[in-house]
């Protein structure tokens, strides 16, 4: 099984799972640009950077799955996703969880609480800038309907 996961926002990265080995490539280290954002460069540059990243870890651009951690639930997301579909060779795709949902899971599962409300607020993500979740040990964090 070969899986590639991309995040194209600030501090972009690519993660590759290749038959039991996980490799993470921080693209700002590859490009030399602090806080590099793959989503803010042309499709040609995206292709070149992804090719360079995969060459660095000696992995072919041929994957069973692409985990798209960037473009769903965002304005103009469909266009950006189509660009990446033409760069990454994959058989199926799934969408990564929301930015704030990841914050909520990180906070809740490290807490001592059995039940909790979690507020996540920052500069933004693919799921907004301010989210509220409720959590139990059985369900984990779930979006609280307002």
PLM region descriptions:
Residues 1-146:
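Short acidic/glycine-rich loops and adjacent helix/strand connectors
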């Amino acid at each position: 099984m070969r899986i590639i996961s991309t995040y194209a926002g600030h501090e972009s990265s690519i993660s590759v799972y290749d038959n039991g080995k996980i490799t993470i490539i921080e693209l700002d280290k590859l490009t030399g640009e602090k806080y590099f954002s793959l989503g803010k460069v042309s499709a040609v540059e995206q292709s070149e950077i992804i090719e360079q990243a995969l060459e660095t870890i000696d992995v072919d651009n041929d994957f069973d799955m692409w985990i798209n951690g960037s473009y769903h639930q965002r304005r103009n997301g469909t266009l950006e996703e189509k660009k990446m579909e033409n760069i990454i060779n994959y058989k199926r795709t799934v969408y990564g969880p929301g930015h704030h949902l990841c914050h909520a899971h990180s906070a809740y599962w490290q807490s001592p609480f059995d039940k909790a409300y979690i507020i996540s607020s920052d500069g933004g993500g693919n799921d907004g800038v301010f989210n509220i979740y409720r959590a139990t040990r059985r369900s984990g964090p779930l979006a609280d309907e307002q």
